[in-house]
UniProtKB/Swiss-Prot annotation:
ATP binds at P90, L91, V92, S93, G94, L95, G96, G97, D98, S99, S100. Pathway: Isoprenoid biosynthesis; isopentenyl diphosphate biosynthesis via DXP pathway; isopentenyl diphosphate from 1-deoxy-D-xylulose 5-phosphate: step 3/6. It catalyses: 4-CDP-2-C-methyl-D-erythritol + ATP = 4-CDP-2-C-methyl-D-erythritol 2-phosphate + ADP + H(+). Its EC number is 2.7.1.148. It comes from Dehalococcoides mccartyi (strain ATCC BAA-2100 / JCM 16839 / KCTC 5957 / BAV1). One of its GO terms (molecular function) is ATP binding. The keyword ATP-binding applies. GO terms for biological process: isopentenyl diphosphate biosynthetic process, methylerythritol 4-phosphate pathway; terpenoid biosynthetic process. The gene is ispE. It is an enzyme of class 2 (transferase). This is 4-diphosphocytidyl-2-C-methyl-D-erythritol kinase.
Amino acid sequence: MLTLLAPAKVNLSLEVLYRRKDGYHELRSIIQSLSLCDRLSFSPSKTVHISSDSQDWQADLSLVSKAVELFSERCGQNTGVNLKIAKRIPLVSGLGGDSSCAAAVLKGLNKLWGCGYPCWRLMEIGAELGSDVPFFIMGGTAMMEGRGETVTPLPTLTQMWAVLLVPALDMPADKTAALYRNLRPDSFTSGEISDKLLESICQGKLSLSLCFNAFEKVAFELFPELVKYRWQFLEAGAYQISLAGAGPTLFTLLKDKNTAEKIYHNLCQKGHQAYLVSTLGPLD
């Protein structure tokens, strides 16, 4: 049996530069893997069988099934697989769980079926599945550009602690598309925010004040209950709070574990769904 981890992520920066002629948006984003991971177990089988320990997760609605089908087409394999997924990343949370699992599927089948594709080829295939998938092939700390297909590894961050607050909100299936539709002219930026953040990372001193998410203002307008959760996060002791991807998860990054633990415990005492995790380097 082959077992792989599929880590969550947060966008330290997420800039939308402009809408492209092909309908996609040009992005510039610095992404960071987290130690909150789904676990995928692969074993040989004559047919494809996918299961999960989460009753809310449906294989046919996820990128996982699409990843198995696409990889089978690309490598010319009709071999099956028995795939079991232990879900830990909250669904539809902005933490990239579906994309991360899809990337793990590509890496796992590449090993299980002996296809021998290099990393760059897996990233090409991943780009056909979704914008975040190429990043998850690599993981760690990276700059993502284009619509997500261009990923450049960055120096691994000195370990930091992230506290995640997952609001108890029912999010629409087209959440990300709705955010894109509601972007305003002042939502678009030049990429300089990510450049400044990149400079601070390369100097080994990440400046949290530079964290930015183009979706944040729009998300708080479309889902006004986020305001309440943000205030409760502040009351728990957080001071620099960002939206994770397309949300609704909110997060804060800290260098001191004790401070992170206090914020985490304060959130849990209030009955919130919260996680205390660390930043993560690239996975093999």
